[in-house]
Amino acid sequence: MEKRIFTEEMVETEVKHQPKQEFSNADIQLDEEPKAVKAELIIEESLKPSRFWLRLFLAALALFGIATIAQSVQWLIDTWQANQWIYFAFAVAFFGISLAGVGAIINEWRKLRWLRKHHYHQQVSQQLLLETADTSGEKAREFCKSVVKNLAQTPMVQQVEQRWQSQLDEAYNSKEVLYLFSENVLSPIDNQVKKLISKNAAENAIIVAVSPLALVDILMVAWRNIALVNKITKAYGMELGYISRLKLFRMVMTNMVFAGATEIASDVGLDFFSQNLTARLSVRAAQGIGMGLLTARLGIKAMEFCRPVVFQQNERPKLSVVRQELIGVLKEQMFSKSREEFEFFHNN
């Protein structure tokens, strides 16, 4: 073997290694939320009907209403002149029903316009948040005042509005004004809605985990979810009709489906499945957690649609918090039930 001689120059050219770097979980940030939001917007735009066909349908509906009113008036005149009192009574009833129907259509149209105005306010708030720091906050102030008018004028809302106005300064830009508005005015409402969502999610989870009848579970949970969305809309001062409520449900459910809520529920169910419980108890508890998470997801999406100002960074409710609450509630409920059954059989 040939002998090798190392010189000082060769030693200096050795590779220098950098010290080891350690990263904590807090330093890792996932970029999934913007992608999910972008996907939801694309889906929502693709599912919107054509403006031409919508206007054509509304025009045909208005023409039908006018024709119905005109026909009922003509029927009233003809039966009155012919002294046909029985037919006249039917004509009066038909005229009243026609007026009620046209009034209901006008009321639904007005509430649909209100829902569209609400979404326009959300877009305006998004634009105000994207403005540069050197812009004036006067436009944001006027926007926030218009939002307060649509909220339910409770003593709490009036108190937090006064506190918000007392903290304003002429030097604040739009983003700072909206931040103060969210912290002072909308934050108490957000907390109430979050408690409402957590309560309904936990109750639905217990219903599914304890009840042995699947059909009854589905019907009861569906009814409770509809009531939950109605309570959320009232909390933010939204007045919805039948059609506008259906439209809101369609948007919420569409975003829920494409956001992969069922995948989240199954993952959490599998995590809980590994707990030291019996197989039967774990399956029922996992089903309850899955349904509770779907309820929480529905409530959070409805909250995002109903909130007049879009959520800023770190304001969006986290599904993981609801998950931990659900696991704790179900553990306590299922363990207490198992303990009662054991004591019952032991005493007998």
Curated annotation (Swiss-Prot):
Family label: Belongs to the UPF0283 family.
GO CC list: plasma membrane
Residues passing through the membrane, by range: 57-77, 86-106, 203-223
Provenance organism: Glaesserella parasuis serovar 5 (strain SH0165) (Haemophilus parasuis)
Cellular localization per UniProt: Cell inner membrane
Record protein name field: UPF0283 membrane protein HAPS_0079
Disulfide bonds, paired cysteine numbers: none
InterPro entries (UniProt xref): DUF697, UPF0283
Keyword match Cell inner membrane: yes
